[in-house]
Amino acid sequence: MLVAALLCALCCGLLAASARAGYSEDRCSWRGSGLTQEPGSVGQLTLDCTEGAIEWLYPAGALRLTLGGSDPGTRPSIVCLRPTRPFAGAQVFAERMAGNLELLLAEGQGLAGGRCMRWGPRERRALFLQATPHRDISRRVAAFQFELHEDQRAEMSPQAQGFGVDGACRPCSDAELLLTACTSDFVIHGTIHGVVHDMELQESVITVVATRVIRQTLPLFQEGSSEGRGQASVRTLLRCGVRPGPGSFLFMGWSRFGEAWLGCAPRFQEFSRVYSAALAAHLNPCEVALD
């Protein structure tokens, strides 16, 4: 029994040492291999930064990843994940209250877009990476970027939870338009100058000309250009089929990994109608300066 206990402790120590060896110097990222991990074991990782990357080669067993240090914050926070290559060999879940798990990245997910979710106050910022079983030993890599930031908003719009996931091309309802206008990182009244399609990333890049910057929390549009208008790129899924067209729109969305991602883009007159009706009925969640 003593020998078995010593062997078990030695194995656990080797697993912990192997995990520690994969950290980057600033402990913001980790790279390691499942070939050194015992089947059925769970490696423990802690990354101290709010931005970083994970690369898990030949996934085996599972990893538990704590983000932003070991202490949970007192404010809600949003975590976003994006594959850095076709995601293979594992699934990524977010830990929720009472030990529940929420799927964020599934095996086979391509490079297009990613997924975000919101942790409440005092929820531990932890991800659970679980290897998926395969009969062969071909090279598989589960690699993704992450970003974590505090969120002071009362609630998270459904459009903010996924950038490049199923439902991203669905038109926003009236209620979603109003909520997105209040919670998004940018609200821009403008026109479509052009659209470029990236076949490799399966994304469309929309060049937006701003008539008016209503709100932005990131330096997306630089006001005061020579023409008095700013241009910026906003991304969406290729399969959404965005094309250049006439008319003015209200572009609303979020900053993800330093890029602007589209949430809702109603025609400006349509949003004005929805907002005016909500204002008259005292149902507007916030004030939007359209004039």
From Swiss-Prot:
Signal peptide: 1-21
Gene Ontology MF terms in the entry: hormone activity
Family the entry assigns: Belongs to the meteorin family.
Disulphide linkage map: 28-49, 80-116, 169-240, 172-264, 182-286
Subunit organization: Monomer.
GO biological process, one term: glial cell differentiation
The UniProt record lists the keyword Secreted: yes
The name this protein goes by in its record: Meteorin
Lineage top rank: taxon: Eukaryota
UniProt entry keywords in alphabetical sequence: Developmental protein, Differentiation, Disulfide bond, Neurogenesis, Secreted, Signal
Subcellular location: Secreted
